[in-house]
A protein has these predicted regions:
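Conserved active-site and cofactor/substrate-binding residues in soluble primary-metabolism enzymes
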Residues: 63-66, 70, 94-97, 149-152, ...
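Divalent-metal coordination cores built from histidine and acidic residues
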Residues: 73-172
Length: 367
């Protein structure tokens, strides 16, 4: 048995002086304490570790960018002990055998807990494994599909699923996949695509809108649905990050969008924080036609902890959005420091800071 004493974040109580007992990887006891002078006390705060329900670890198929080992190591370095990987690897994770192969690779390489999303394709709900495959969720992309089929598939899966349907909500009719388009055109095209998509998406408690990025998108969220926001859509914008290195999907938006989304995030209207970690090689991002995406799983928690230090964000909101809310959305018993939960927590000293140098980063793209 291991014992940790310190000031910990306990759900519905806040910061409490506690003694945490851990056995076989799970919390066996959490007790209020006056601290044992003969036992070392944790220097700083004990917070629930984060769960990132939106990562792209590039394995299989694109391991020159990243694999499950480096991706999960960067997650652990950033205080993230559970991730859900998106299906747009090579091959796409679209059927049971592809799911099992990715699961095999992840079990072999990952140093954190993981879930896997499955891509929505034609006739998915008719497959004999549809109701039994242990996927974290279904994922619907707008690429290479007509708008009619996109919304039909969404309706079909939502009508039969008991798992979340995560949608990359950009309307197929309004997307332009020209890799040479300048950043301003890329942003405008994707702005129209997101808002049009959201206005046509059917309401459902199983619907989850990935990486919300605009004020109008927030206003057009389908009823009963949940959503997430990424640090780069809260902190970066077209004024402070204008180079093609900053090309992501959905794109960076305006300062006004930053402020509106941040306010909704503070209030809990946007319940979940996710990174949309999507690394590429340095050479790819520095090319004349860089692919969309940037790393984030290693920096998501530190960036938002800095927001707490600067008093722009309450610690309670951060803990809920990075640990409790994503676990609850996926129906998982984790994300809290309480008896019976996985012993996944991190030690944080808000009085210390450091610079992240690319040579220190676990993530391959940051090096």
């Amino acid at each position: 048995m291991s014992v940790f004493e310190g000031r910990a974040w306990i759900s519905n109580q806040g910061l409490v002086d506690v003694s945490i007992e851990v056995e076989k990887g799970y919390i066996s006891s959490v007790k209020k304490t006056n601290f044992n002078p003969n036992r070392e006390k944790v220097d700083g705060l004990i917070l629930p570790a984060a769960m990132d329900m939106h990562v792209h670890f590039r394995d299989p198929g694109y391991t020159h960018k990243e694999d499950w080992k480096t991706g999960s190591e960067s997650a652990a370095c950033g205080g993230v002990t559970a991730v859900v990987d998106m299906p747009n690897t090579n091959p796409f994770t679209s059927d049971y055998s592809q799911f099992k192969e990715k699961e095999r690779i992840a079990k072999q390489k990952s140093v954190v807990d993981f879930g896997i999303g499955i891509n929505v394709e034609e006739n998915l709900t008719e497959q004999d494994w549809f109701e039994t495959v242990p996927a974290a969720f279904w994922k619907l992309y707008p690429y290479g599909i007509s708008s009619k089929d996109y919304f039909r598939l969404a309706q079909e899966v939502l009508g039969k699923t008991k798992k979340p349907l995560v949608v990359h909500c950009e309307h197929p009719d309004y997307m332009h996949n020209n890799p040479l388009e300048k950043l301003s055109d890329h942003t405008e095209n994707r702005l129209i695509a997101e808002e049009k998509c959201l206005s046509e998406m059917p309401p459902s408690k199983y619907l989850h809108v990935a990486h919300l990025s605009t004020s109008n998108g927030l206003r057009n969220l389908p009823s009963q649905s949940s959503t997430e926001v990424c640090p780069h859509h809260l902190l970066l914008n077209l004024d402070n990050c204008r180079s093609l290195d900053c090309k992501v999907d959905p794109p960076l938006r305006t300062i006004s969008d930053n402020k509106t989304l941040y306010d909704a995030y503070r209030k809990g209207t946007i319940p979940i924080l996710a990174s949309d970690h999507a690394p590429h090689t340095v050479e790819e991002k520095r090319s004349s036609a860089p692919p969309s995406g940037m790393p984030g799983v290693e920096t998501m928690v530190p960036l938002m902890l800095q927001e707490v230090v600067e008093k722009r964000l309450d610690l309670s909101r951060l803990v809920n959005s990075m640990a409790e809310a994503p676990a609850d959305r996926l129906g998982l018993s984790r994300g809290r420091i309480e008896k019976g939960q996985p012993a996944d927590f991190m030690f944080v000293n808000l009085n210390k800071s450091c610079l992240l140098y690319t040579s220190d980063a676990a993530d391959e793209e940051l090096r």
